[in-house]
Amino acid sequence: MKVKCLLAVFLIVLIAAEHCQALFFLPSLIGGLISAFKGRRKRELGTQFQPRQKNFMRREVDLERLFAEMPDY
């Protein structure tokens, strides 16, 4: 069932891409379908957001230092 749905989506996008002559979009679509078949797209969302939060905290500290060093006008 899953394979049939993915193939149907692929064919619809293929027809739309050919109609719009957007051939540069097709390689990424084919790569996405192959990785979906192989199951590489399954990732945990929690691990993706943790490094970004650390970066945000570091940037916040850097901004506080920058504002502390700025002269008051």
UniProtKB/Swiss-Prot annotation:
GO BP of this protein: defense response to bacterium
Nucleus found in the keyword field: no
Lineage: superkingdom: Eukaryota
Tissue expression notes: Expressed by the venom gland.
Localization annotation: Secreted; Target cell membrane
Chain positions found as Lysine amide: 38
GO cellular component: extracellular region; membrane; other organism cell membrane
Assigned keywords, A-Z: Amidation, Antibiotic, Antimicrobial, Cleavage on pair of basic residues, Membrane, Secreted, Signal, Target cell membrane, Target membrane, Transmembrane
Signal peptide (UniProt feature, chain positions): 1-22
UniProt keyword Transmembrane, yes or no: yes
Residue ranges annotated as propeptide in the record: 44-73
Function (record text): Cationic host defense peptide that have antibacterial activity by breaking membranes. Is more effective on Gram-positive than on Gram-negative bacteria.
Family according to the record: Belongs to the non-disulfide-bridged peptide (NDBP) superfamily. Short antimicrobial peptide (group 4) family.
Protein's recorded name: Mucroporin-like peptide
Protein species of origin: Lychas mucronatus (Chinese swimming scorpion)
